[in-house]
């Protein structure tokens, strides 16, 4: 596996075959797709940490869906990928739908997990609240956000029986830089 840093964006490139590009959700990282890697063993898998997320360096300037789309196009150009299968989760599904409109020739197929066209109004309100908490309280705010998301996103049974899943989600969210997380929420 090769790890690249293109314009402050961390990109993992592994395997050979048709390109499959994975785009994580809010608070996620390229590691979100680790469980899929055995099934994709015959593919070239590109896993990107979106600007301001996970191992990507702090994003300068605005963070937006349009910026994420531009980033994906730039990464594909740098890696000589003319067409790819795309896999997205949550926020990543919004990004990929926009990519399909902006650069349809780049998209061989889409696999969308937890797809959204845009967050509904109640979710937008919750995202603004998360942004304010992350920005004003920093790491303590991220801890509180993480605990709330763990309780909302994982069942009590999962939280009890699968501590590794809980640890993975907690680690993914707690590794986000609070200001960049806030800007992504907005």
What is each model feature region?
Residues 68, 86-88, 113:
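Short beta-strand immediately N-terminal to the catalytic nucleophile in serine-hydrolase-like folds
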């Amino acid at each position: 596996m090769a790890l690249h840093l293109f314009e402050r964006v961390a990109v993992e490139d592994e395997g050979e075959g048709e390109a499959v590009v994975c785009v994580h959700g809010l608070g996620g990282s390229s590691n979100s797709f680790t469980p899929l890697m055995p099934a994709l063993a015959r593919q070239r898998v590109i896993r990107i940490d979106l600007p301001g997320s996970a191992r990507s360096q702090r994003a300068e300037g605005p963070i937006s869906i349009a910026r994420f789309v531009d980033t994906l196009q730039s990464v594909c150009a740098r890696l000589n990928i003319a067409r790819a299968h795309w896999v997205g989760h949550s926020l990543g599904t919004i990004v990929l739908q926009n990519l399909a409109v902006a650069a349809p020739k780049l998209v061989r197929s889409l696999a969308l997990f937890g797809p959204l066209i845009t967050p509904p109004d109640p979710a937008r309100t919750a995202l603004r609240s998360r942004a304010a908490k992350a920005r004003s309280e920093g790491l303590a705010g991220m801890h509180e956000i993480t605990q709330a998301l763990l309780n909302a996103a994982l069942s009590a049974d999962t939280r009890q029986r699968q501590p590794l899943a809980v640890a993975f989600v907690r680690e993914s969210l707690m590794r986000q830089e609070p200001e960049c997380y806030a800007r992504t929420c907005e």
